[in-house]
């Protein structure tokens, strides 16, 4: 089973191949952490990476509280870096079977 660092590295490579520019990794605040901050064209994308193997889908570990913390941390990042414009939260699932990218929650 891969560890979270390996999963995040694979997710970064995957996103770069899709044309994303990685801006930051493991951004932390008192609200929470964002695994990857990237740019997709004009949009800032905050990426949560989940990995695992077995019967439980890694995405099942994302609950409403986690989503709210991600949104709050993302908003803080935008303010701290004086960024305006569209932003969203995406999820990347990394399993032994492959990588899935879910473009997700729009922040505005």
Swiss-Prot record:
GO terms for molecular function: nucleic acid binding. CDD domains: PoNe_Nuclease (cd20736). Pfam families: UPF0102. It comes from the Bacteria. Coiled coil: none annotated. InterPro entries: Restrct_endonuc-II-like, tRNA_endonuc-like_dom_sf, UPF0102_YraN-like. Belongs to the UPF0102 family. NCBIfam families: PRK14677.1. This is UPF0102 protein TM_0253.
